[in-house]
């Protein structure tokens, strides 16, 4: 039965497992599409326009924002990043789900956008701050200064947990993955996401009349 797609927002402090859960979710269901962001930064070696990012000039990006063509946007280290609305709207209409791996500010903008009714938002918490610190250090890719900055930012990010529809405490990655799948499966079955249900039920009622 046909259904309308949904916008799945996944947010967490750095190190809580958001990116790993996102990858596992799309491996479980390849039909889920990652939102491709637009950016004004220069392409890195191997990056392809339209696949990794939509690369835009600063003027093009600002014009898109002013025209209401971005679901959310922010400036990070002198470069603009944002989520173009048109590809997401097309995916929704075709019944495809779009996954946003974004922070609470981006999630807030999308929830307040014209597509807010299609949003399912999930916040991922660490089991403890000590474990969060351990996970960041286990990556062995950040300096002490970067880790300290990420930990300081985490306190602010965690303070927004109550703005989300669902909250997962990632004590065990496999369990958190299963919980994430259950949330998505249930949300896909919501009555308002199944536009063909009315006709289906009419058909059932018609069968009563022909018995």
Curated annotation (Swiss-Prot):
Major enzyme class: transferase
Pfam family for this entry, one: Guanylate_kin
Chief localization: cytoplasm
Residues given in the record as ATP binding sites: 12-19
Compartmental location: Cytoplasm
Any one Gene Ontology cellular component term annotated for this protein: cytosol
Keywords annotated in UniProt: ATP-binding, Cytoplasm, Kinase, Nucleotide-binding, Transferase
Catalytic activity: GMP + ATP = GDP + ADP
Protein function: Essential for recycling GMP and indirectly, cGMP.
Family statement: Belongs to the guanylate kinase family.
Gene name in the database record: gmk
Protein name: Guanylate kinase
Keyword ATP-binding tagged: yes
Source species: Cereibacter sphaeroides (strain ATCC 17023 / DSM 158 / JCM 6121 / CCUG 31486 / LMG 2827 / NBRC 12203 / NCIMB 8253 / ATH 2.4.1.) (Rhodobacter sphaeroides)
PANTHER family: GUANYLATE KINASE, GUANYLATE KINASE-RELATED
An MF annotation (GO) of this entry: ATP binding
UniProt xrefs under Gene3D superfamilies: Guanylate Kinase phosphate binding domain, P-loop containing nucleotide triphosphate hydrolases
Domain of life where this protein originates: Bacteria
